[in-house]
Amino acid sequence: MTLQYSAVGIQNESHMATSIDDYWKDLERLQTSIAYSVWNCSLDLPVQLVSVSEGGIGGWCLGGGEEHLRIYNEVVPEIPGKETEFLGEICKQFNIFLIAQMVAKVPDLMPDRIFNVAFIIDPNGELIHTHIKTSFYQKETNTAPSDIWDVYLEKYGDDPEKLHDALYPVAKTEIGNIGTLICAEGSYPEAARGLAMNGAEIIYRSQYPEPWMGNNMNQIQNQSHAIFNTCYVLAPNIGGIYMPGGEDFKFSNGKSQIIDYRGQIISEYLSGGEALVSAIINIDGLRDFRLRGQWQNLAKDMRVEEYKVIYDAMMAKGGIYPKNLCMDEPPFTEEDQVELVKHQVNKMVKLGIYTAPKNWEPYKIKESVAERIKKTEAEL
């Protein structure tokens, strides 16, 4: 029998968590949403895969500096924990794989740091995949792997294959090989390629906020990931998020999509609010195309030596983004993130990558931020 089934992206409304109770409000609502999606969308083919967007469980719960430590201690859940166990019971009830995300602590990796984590739970209720978000937009004050790079080197050594598996894990399941990207990660083609090179056939790439949904940047990125890597892209977004300040204070998002391995949109919901997208995922068709196609199964033709020199050259120049920024201190505050952006722009101009307009002067950087960056550079 051909391996094909229905997949669902749930576009739910959620809460920007100020306590663990807000996570549970979203979890309990999702129980109903998942039940409906399986009940209705199985009229096409049985639903075997359900996904929930970044922010769909507890929002983003942001805070740098001392606020980061308070949120760690008082708000965010732990993965694995009661929340993933609750979702595991739902997966067992409906015999589905579930992809979701939470801002959470992962004490086995590093205490006192908050991570943005995508995860997959199988039909037996088991947590089979976790992925730590590797890059952020400037309003997110969580911890990425490169922020604690020495922890990764201690855990995995400098073996590139082990680090590749740790940074871009892929769950090899009976319904296909699934990798996960979270929001800003999908802004970088390398992240999706990292999953593809570990065998991904389905890439979950969760939401972008506005204005980058309405101007189609998110869609263009996701279609590109699908084409470049011959993968399905499952891209749910939140339907809206209740901000701290009252149940009537809500921002909408929307535009959830599913894209096939040829880059075609096969399901979408353009508006905000609670909804879902669903499409038939034909894994055997994808596998057949990868094996019999001559050209657009592009990964087979990667001349890796030619691309490797790009990053070798950047490393020889000291790298781009400073690593190990959160080994000794929590992530920057939003205010200090702006200072970090200034530093990065100055660096790109200095390296000759960006060309500045006439009469441009390098940005002045807040001294405390400059010192923290300088400390990481001194350790190179």
Regions from the PLM with identified roles:
Residues H15-K25, V76, T143-V151:
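Acidic/histidine-rich helix-loop elements
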Residues D108-E201, E210-S224:
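Active-site catalytic loop in hydrolytic enzyme cores
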Residues I79-I99, N177, C183-S278, M348, ...:
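CN hydrolase (nitrilase-like) catalytic-core segments centered on the catalytic cysteine
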Residues T2-S19, Y23, S51, V117, ...:
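Active-site-proximal beta-strand elements of phosphoester/diester hydrolases
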Residues N237-L380:
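C-terminal beta-strand edge segments of enzyme domains
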Residues W24, E28, T32-I132, Q138-N142, ...:
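Cys-nucleophile CN-hydrolase/nitrilase-fold catalytic domain and related Cys-dependent amidase chemistry
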Residues A100-M102, N116-I120, P169-V170, S256-I258, ...:
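Short beta-strand scaffold segments in enzyme catalytic cores
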Residues I20-Y23, L43, F97, L167-V170, ...:
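Eukaryotic scaffold repeat domains enriched in small/polar residues
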